[in-house]
Amino acid sequence: MTVSIDGVSKYFLKQTGTVQVLENINFQLEEGDFVTVIGPSGCGKSTLLKIVAGLDNDFEGEVVIDGEPILKTSKKQGFIFQEHRLFPWLTVEENIAADLSLKDKYVKDKVREWVEIVRLDGFEKSYPKEISGGMSQRVAIARALLRDPNVLLLDEPFGALDAFTRSHLQEVLLNIWEQKKTTMIFVTHDIDEAIYLSNRIIIMSAKPGKIHKVIENNLPYPRNKTSQSFQQLRTKVLQQFEYGGLIQTSI
């Protein structure tokens, strides 16, 4: 399974004229890759994810998953937003199943499997208002992975959470990745998060958004954020922002 992003450019039409958001984005992912995308605000990271997800088909270039051009959403792509976007009138297990029927034994068994993987045992019948924000994001992760997508796209899914919950969900996500080897593209503003999670870090520059640098991350798992090797890689990434002219409002 491969994901190929070839020559992707994106323009928005505004009252003041045409604005280019992405310029000639090219990269490939092999099965089981975990890639993080990081860059200044406004560099088009989220726009790129929406294109790969098939949520935006008004672009130049091509996105191909398993040899098939992507122009619409499909079961090949799972998407997790910063907000969990759960249906408040559905229980945890019903949200995970989404439009699939829990009366189907296969669906019921799959939902039960994912409830266990994301550690929500005992909360299957709970409603979103009865669980925490971190638990709600675990439901969103399970929902996105229930259909076994070829690639999971994550748009700053832990950005609004407190540090302790974010750290816990990073571990949950890594455990899932190690078990399932789902290919992942994860957008973040957090350099430590990018280094901790992925095996490749794509650094983007802004206006228009383009790939500034790709850094291979060969640190062994599990990773220690206080280790010398982690800090050395962190310095290497930071230098791209400091000396590459990428720092604007935030990283």
Swiss-Prot record:
GO terms for cellular component: plasma membrane. Its EC number is 7.6.2.14. Residues 3-231 form the ABC transporter domain. Keywords: ATP-binding, Cell membrane, Membrane, Nucleotide-binding, Translocase, Transport. The keyword Translocase applies. GO terms for molecular function: ATP binding; ATP hydrolysis activity. It holds the Pfam family ABC_tran. It is an enzyme of class 7 (translocase). It is a peripheral membrane protein. It is found in: Cell membrane. It catalyses: ATP + H2O + aliphatic sulfonate-[sulfonate-binding protein]Side 1 = ADP + phosphate + aliphatic sulfonateSide 2 + [sulfonate-binding protein]Side 1. ATP binds at G39, P40, S41, G42, C43, G44, K45, S46. Belongs to the ABC transporter superfamily. Aliphatic sulfonates importer (TC 3.A.1.17.2) family. Part of the ABC transporter complex SsuABC involved in aliphatic sulfonates import. Responsible for energy coupling to the transport system. The complex is composed of two ATP-binding proteins (SsuB), two transmembrane proteins (SsuC) and a solute-binding protein (SsuA). This is Aliphatic sulfonates import ATP-binding protein SsuB. It comes from Bacillus cereus (strain ATCC 14579 / DSM 31 / CCUG 7414 / JCM 2152 / NBRC 15305 / NCIMB 9373 / NCTC 2599 / NRRL B-3711).
